[in-house]
Amino acid sequence: NLDKAKDCRSETNEVIIVEGYMDVVSLYSSGIKNVIANSGTALTERQIDIIWKFFSNPIICLDGDISGQKAALRIAEKLFPLINEENKIYFSTLPNGNDPDDFIKQNGKKIFLSHLKEKQVVQTYIWNFHINKIDKNNPFEISKFEKEIKKMCYSIKDETLKKYVLEDFL
């Protein structure tokens, strides 16, 4: 659906990336045209490079269940080193374990788009996912978490951005 989605680019330069074909069909038939399917839970560097040629602000919106959230985290951590000031990645997690198909059928376009406005940039998504899993009173867990975050930040290829993301995290 990339060919149709790129014809619907808006001033926000966003595209919604969902897991499956039915998600695309439901969103598209609801009037959301800037949507593409990843056909699964993996997203490669090659795929994101192609997407970035047309959209600088992709929004990953996988299923809101546990497996969808874990898949989104894997994507976030894999693509995190590639971000720069022109090409970003955002994440939107649907509530109550919903997938985009079910969510839009139950809530409609307006509420879906309203929910998308709460998207998180990749570094915030990673931070929030991990910070909610650790015992904040356990110095060993905090230390391990800080080391993992630093390691991820050092992987950012854009040196200037790396500096500011590190400052933001720590």
Specify the residue positions occupied by each region the protein language model found.
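Short, flexible active-site loop motifs that bind/organize anionic cofactors or intermediates
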Residues: 17, 38, 62, 90, ...
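Phosphate-handling DNA/RNA-contact segment within nucleic-acid enzymes
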Residues: 1-54, 58, 71-72
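Alpha-helical scaffold segments in soluble metabolic enzymes
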Residues: 4-7, 26, 50, 74, ...
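Short, surface-exposed helix-loop/turn micro-motifs enriched in polar/charged residues
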Residues: 16-19, 35, 50, 67, ...
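Conserved catalytic cores of soluble enzyme domains
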Residues: 10, 41-96, 102-109
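C-terminal or mid-to-C-terminal helical accessory/interaction module adjacent to the motor/catalytic core
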Residues: 86-169
